[in-house]
Amino acid sequence: MSVKIRLARRGAKKKPFYRIVAADVESPRDGKFLESVGTYDPMVEPAAIILNEERIRYWMGEGATPTTTVKSILKKQGFSSNPA
């Protein structure tokens, strides 16, 4: 099973809200996920980002790879991608 850390869209039409989740690569975008590791709300200024860094480090240590968008969110938050 290959795992990605990616965004799962929630919210209403024209008002997106995202969960940052660890999910199997074969699961649909908004489908089943293994664990929710944060949230991202782009509709507020500045964007509201909440991360569970401990769990993100755990999943990256287990071999999960973040998507490009999640990588940029983690970088904005000053998150080191090195599992330690």
Curated annotation (Swiss-Prot):
Pfam families: Ribosomal_S16. The keyword Ribonucleoprotein applies. Signal peptide: none annotated. One of its GO terms (molecular function) is structural constituent of ribosome. The keyword Ribonucleoprotein applies. One of its GO terms (cellular component) is small ribosomal subunit. PROSITE patterns: RIBOSOMAL_S16. InterPro entries: Ribosomal_bS16, Ribosomal_bS16_CS, Ribosomal_bS16_dom_sf. GO terms for biological process: translation. Gene3D superfamilies: 3.30.1320.10. Keywords: Ribonucleoprotein, Ribosomal protein. Belongs to the bacterial ribosomal protein bS16 family. This is Small ribosomal subunit protein bS16. The gene is rpsP.
